[in-house]
Structures are given as C-alpha cells and as structure tokens.
Swiss-Prot record:
Location(s), subcellular: Secreted
Task of the protein: Together with the alpha chain CGA constitutes follitropin, the follicle-stimulating hormone, and provides its biological specificity to the hormone heterodimer. Binds FSHR, a G protein-coupled receptor, on target cells to activate downstream signaling pathways. Follitropin is involved in follicle development and spermatogenesis in reproductive organs.
An example Gene Ontology biological process: regulation of signaling receptor activity
Family: Belongs to the glycoprotein hormones subunit beta family.
One GO CC annotation: follicle-stimulating hormone complex
Designated name of the protein: Follitropin subunit beta
PANTHER family: FOLLITROPIN SUBUNIT BETA (PTHR11515:SF17), GLYCOPROTEIN HORMONE BETA CHAIN (PTHR11515)
SMART domains: GHB
InterPro entries attached to this UniProt entry: Cystine-knot_cytokine, Glyco_hormone_CN, Gonadotropin_bsu, Gonadotropin_bsu_CS
Disulfide bridge positions per record: C21-C69, C35-C84, C38-C122, C46-C100, C50-C102, C105-C112
Gene name linked to the record: FSHB
Species whose genome carries this gene: Macaca fascicularis (Crab-eating macaque)
Amino acid sequence: MKTVQFCFLFCCWKAICCNSCELTNITIAIEKEECRFCISINTTWCAGYCYTRDLVYKDPARPNIQKTCTFKEVVYETVRVPGCAHHADSLYTYPVATQCHCGKCDSDSTDCTVRGLGPSYCSFSEMKE
C-alpha cells in the first residue's frame, strides 16, 4: 500500500513541478496557389505542458502571465514545391524549432489562440517528399 501511495505522490509531484515541454516531430502540408502539388514534410516543433495557474481574484497591479510550451530557438528551412508555373516562385520557407521552453507566448510569431489553426491538409494532389 505504501508503494502505491508513493507512486501516486511521485506522479503528482512530477506533474506539478516538472515541465514536459520538448521538441516533437510533426508533419505539415505545404502548398502554393501557383503550383499544382502539395507536399508533406517532417519538421520539429514544441509540444507539452507547462506549469501555470489562473488566479480566482485578479490583481490589476500584478500581471497574470500564462506560460506556454513554445520555441526558444528556431531556424528556417526552404523546400521547392513541384509543379509551379515558370513565372511562379516555387520556394517555400518554414520554421523548424531547435530548442523549447516554457514562456510567454509571442503573438508576433506564434498562434497564441485557444484553438489553433487546425489540422494541416492538402487542397491539391499530394506528393510525398
């Protein structure tokens, strides 16, 4: 019985005290209106949980900053989308997270809404890269 209690308390401590914000592999669909094809590429992004709390009584003198799992460092990679017309730019640049942390969401570079952009899907025929 003591082992079960210890395991329960350890799991609670782990959930409360430790953040599990880390790099994860994702697949995104890339397409351009000028091109006939859509490609799916694998990249890395940040996902997980960060310790946060929402106070019952709001103090206007003290801002309540909710922390979210977001990137600390990001690099950009470029791919060529096939099937583009000769006059069209076939290059597409996308972000790749290289380091994550729990911090304030930067709405200048990130979708900070409760419900994000939704699933990534192709409108055109898909070509695996």
